[in-house]
Amino acid sequence: MSAPGAGGTQGFFQDAPQLANTFEGDRVLRQSLQRLLPADAWGDVRGDLTRFGERAAREMLPLADEAERKPPSLVRFDAWGNRVDAIETTPAWGRLHDIAAEEGIVAIGYERAHGRYSRVHQMAKLHLFHPSSAIVSCPLAMTDGAARLLEGQTEGAGKKVAARALPRLTSRDPSVFWTSGQWMTERTGGSDVGRSETVARAVAGLPREGTHRLYGTKWFTSATTSEMTMTLARIEEPDGTVPAGSRGLSLFYAETHGEDGRLADIEILRLKDKLGTKALPTAELQLRGTPATLVGAPGRGVPTITRLINVTRLYNTVCAVSSLRRGVALARDFASRRHVFGRPLAQQPLHLTTLAALEVELHGSTVLEMHCASLLGAEDCGEASADDVAELRLLTPLAKLYTARQGVAGMSEVVESFGGAGYVEDTGIPRMLRDAQVLSIWEGTTNVLSLDALRAIQRDEALGPVLGRAMSRAGAAAKAVPGALNRASSSSSQASNSKPPVASAWPPSRA
């Protein structure tokens, strides 16, 4: 008889962590929703999210793993030498897109079945969707942002574009559903759009309400397989000059393919080889006269696009929080399965303290993301007070910058909590850390968002209303402290009369 462990099929094998229904396993999310939603809305939303939490864990997760294993590739030429610049993705990536449409990840925010609370429902569903999506959540963020921007276009070419695109951006039918890009970053920079070089030349007679052709390089375009995009460019004057600075930028709508199905005068220079988000197609593009339509007033591109960016920053916040929630959920399950020094890892006090600290961080961030969603929903429906608007203006950059940094630090703890297994690629844990890193870069880095928060305070005078509300909430919370302390004291007294099972788990025996 061979000794245990003598062969690759003998000896100890560690059970892998298991993912249960992602909604039922997120107590803080459920509590936040129950607190924010009216009773009838809570009943509907709870049923929808309970069902979807199972789908995210069972159907979506294997699709996401497949999409990650087979990243997109660029095919420059067909068999006969014709330039095609086709980005090939896996069927799994396409199926995840279909699920996004079927589940109404974008549509919920525009169907408004629960009025101002629809954004809360939508963002809670995104919270469950994102960690199982192979970053399909990225094109959804830009799609939602474009939908919100176009929804506000009520005149001129922008209104005509909205009539064509908005029903597609908000559809639940996968055969109709469009996603949108957001082509801002150029070689000159991302957040500093004032140095953008793309030029728009007025041309008459273009199809699909086109008003201009675009010429320039877009250095970092995520979700390049989308059907349309919003982008910035400088309108060329009749004398060939272009206006400088951010005030010289105008906003344009462009469809990525012409009526013949070919790219609309777009050349894909290369796909980006990134640290993470490997399943997400990200490309460097050359616009060679791409037909586009001016949206909004000339030279007002940056103010116009603010409606879009507020949405994408909220998506970033939700994705950061939900990614860490997924990591902690797996770490907790692993801790119940992994035994060290004769006890489950979950009974080792130091490890338990580490997980508890992450849970505390997640609790606050989950409440924050849902609160921001509630404010956005009120603004969408015209029910936001002046204080609501001020709070949303300030919290949007602050929530994004804080949760993104929190996500990177927290995911590093998650990797460490798995020990060596957390450093091995085929467990999927290292990928979670790499993917978390982009969330502090997308939609503005920490410093850029800090400056935006400063503008909200100085220019928009948002701090006063926010502090006033914070003091009011703190006062209400303080009134509840005595009762909470009494309950804690009672629990402590009961606990002191019994010896907890973790008492003998540390330090480990040296025998």
State where each predicted segment sits.
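Extended, charge-enriched "interface" segments that sit outside catalytic cores
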Residues: 1-115
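Alpha-helix capping/hinge segments and adjacent helical runs
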Residues: 4-8, 24, 43-47, 51-58, ...
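A glycine-rich, basic-preceded beta-loop-alpha segment at the flavin cofactor/substrate interface
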Residues: 114, 259-265, 269, 274, ...
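Flexible glycine/proline-rich, aromatic-decorated loop/lid segments
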Residues: 277-306, 420-446
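Extended amphipathic alpha-helical segments enriched in small hydrophobics
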Residues: 313-381, 464-489, 498, 502-511
